[in-house]
Amino acid sequence: MLKTLLIHDASSFSSRKNAPPPIIACSSTTEVHRAISLYIKPQDFVLELGAQLSDTSTHLCRTIGSDGRAVLVDVKRKDATSGRCSNRNTAPFIASNEDGESSNEESFLDRVQYEELEQFDHWRSLTKGKSYQAMVLDVGSMIGNDLYLSALSLAGEFIANQENPPRVIIVKSKTLSNLARRIVHSQRLLDGSTILPDILERTHNPIVVPCVGVNEYRRTIPFLVNGGDDVIEVGCHFGRTTTLLHDAVIKEEGGADGEQGQGFCAGVDIGPKIIANAKKQYPEINFEVVDAWNTLDLLKVKAEHCAVGTSMLGYDVVYADIGGLSGAYGLLESLALLDAIAKALEPRSIVIKSLCMNRLASQLVAFSHVWNKIETK
């Protein structure tokens, strides 16, 4: 029953025309094993990157059955630096050249191709023109660091190299799982299918809400901005959205219309002429010329306009509408900018107008969320 429910959840992605396969982000080996049980099918052709020929590889091979195929890939390394036990049992996966009686232990030689690569980049040669149904990726094992940008880059390249789109990608990565738990598709927020907690703390791991189009971008304001908040719009252009943010923060929370709160709002953009126009049209709002990537300057905007101590720096909510990042391309650049803003400004939430980020919010799934949903049924 659980398998039927979760496979239906994943198949909803593939039912959408031209929709990319879901990326299932797992934070632990236990979650990976559960995801394999629920998303991988008998007879599947699966690539495992970062195969350690241990429990995960065993579970994968059992799941695909004798009619399935698995390409298990790892990079060559010394036992002393790999974190592995030197006496790990590879017999079920690698044929022995030693003569003697056959072993009675379980063997997967009928379905496994094991590749130990001299260089990490060689993994691409195993994917081009192939038609894998799935990939299981252990980011930390494969590249040595658990970085979600690397995980998404590898997943994207794997998809692009396939002759036919894979059905699912399962990734073991705590950082990617963390991102998946924080990213909220704008439509789910606006239609009420995702309800945020009443109280969100400011943090370097804020909620991220990607939007498509300026109307959707502005419609999120009542859901995320409170009276008395400190808010900045990065990429304010001529300042129209900034004025809406300004109106939202100056209203006293719980007060009557027109009652003034103590919030702060500013808009920044890299274009001096744009900012000059915004200042002329909306003189009551703080506008400054600032590059979005200069996060220290974003902090200085508030410091220069408010008599606050260092502990009060940063913002409750950040809105971002950056030229070059709002379209279908620039995903890794968008994530890098969001990461820089989050670490420097520590907001509760970041709203970004970006089609590529919105698509990621549709594709990236925190396995913990899916499992919790199934557990409660």
What do these predicted regions represent?
Residues 141-202, 324-377:
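C-terminal substrate-binding/active-site "lid" region of AdoMet-derived donor-dependent transferases
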Residues 116-123, 290-296:
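Conserved SAM/SAH-binding loop
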Residues 76, 271:
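Conserved SAM/SAH-binding beta-strand->alpha-helix loop
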Residues 52-53, 237:
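Conserved glycine-rich SAM-binding loop
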